[in-house]
Curated annotation (Swiss-Prot):
InterPro entries: Bombinin. The keyword Secreted applies. The modification Leucine amide is found at L143. Residues 19-43, 74-123 form a propeptide. Keywords: Amidation, Amphibian defense peptide, Antibiotic, Antimicrobial, Cleavage on pair of basic residues, Cytolysis, Fungicide, Hemolysis, Secreted, Signal. GO terms for cellular component: extracellular region. The keyword Signal applies. It comes from Bombina maxima (Giant fire-bellied toad). Its main location: secreted. This is Maximins 8/H7.
Length: 144
């Protein structure tokens, strides 16, 4: 009789353990899905902000470039125009960063993708912002 109880209790413990393992796997997969959706939302927001900023900067740079085109240029003005053109090319290369990032990072896990995307943004945006700051500073110095 005791043997039957031992077998029954063992069976109940084993089935409870199997159910808990199954629930753990489901909760982990749900958590992974939520993390992936969060990363996509963050990237989408970042891309929209970057796109708006890029559009504003491109408009300002085109306005500054047209101002320089209409007047006489010195060697310094010519250098500023070259910088503006380089910045415009850099901004144009940012048109589809997410697609390029997806192509380059196929097979990586989500954390590596997020780190690579952030590093790529820093690598591109750092020099662009520095150049824009220098150009605008030079323009203000020349105009003032």
């Amino acid at each position: 009789m005791k043997f039957k109880y031992i077998v029954a209790v063992s069976f109940l413990i084993a089935s409870a353990y199997a159910r808990s393992e199954e629930n753990d796997e489901q909760s982990l997969s749900q958590r992974d899905v939520l993390e992936e959706e969060s990363l996509r939302e963050i990237r989408g927001i970042g891309t929209k902000i970057l796109g708006g900023l890029k559009t504003a900067v491109k408009g300002a740079l085109k306005e500054l470039a047209s101002t320089y085109v209409n007047g006489k240029r010195t060697a310094e003005d010519h250098e500023v125009m070259k910088r503006l053109e380089a910045v415009m090319r850099d901004l144009d290369s940012l048109d589809y960063p997410e697609e390029a990032s997806e192509r380059e990072t196929r097979g990586f896990n989500q954390e590596e993708i997020a780190n690579l995307f952030t590093k790529k943004e820093k690598r591109i945006l750092g020099p662009v912002i520095k150049t824009i700051g220098g150009v605008i500073g030079g323009l203000l110095k020349n105009l003032g």
